């Protein structure tokens, strides 16, 4: 995580690489890679995910800003039969947003537009990666009036 601020600029970025990141409210999970036929005991392989984002805001009274984000499912690295978790059929997600806020003492008024696109597909059992993807897009507009004390 990096962050830079001064009188006019706010710049922040973060990148995460991890396995089974569902406990951090991110995409991820695990897959069953082996089942002992005698005891029924299962072996698991975690889904590896990478996620990065960048946020840049400029100004004092009027503050335009942009947000860019990307998440990628890197698979399990092992052959798996079934996946458990959050968004296990998502290959990648791209997010881009623009915002404009007006800031005065104790008040913030703003408008934000965000476009998100997720590529869904089916699991490749040889490595837990997602194949045969198609994208779904979401448009979001948010308005805010915030009193700060």
What residues fall within each predicted segment?
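Secondary-structure boundary/capping motif
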Residues: 12, 60, 65, 113, ...
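Short proline/glycine-enriched turn/loop segments at secondary-structure junctions
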Residues: 130-134
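Solvent-exposed loop and beta-edge segments used for protein-protein assembly and interaction
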Residues: 5, 103, 135-137
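C-terminal beta-signal and adjacent terminal beta-strands/loops
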Residues: 106-108, 114-127
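Detector for outer-membrane/organellar transmembrane beta-barrel domains
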Residues: 1-90, 94
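Outer-membrane beta-barrel "beta-signal"
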Residues: 135-149
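Short, loop-centered acidic/histidine patches that primarily coordinate divalent metals
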Residues: 67-71, 91, 95-105, 112-116
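Residues on the lipid-exposed face of transmembrane beta-strands in outer-membrane beta-barrel proteins
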Residues: 2-4, 52-58, 98-102, 111-113, ...
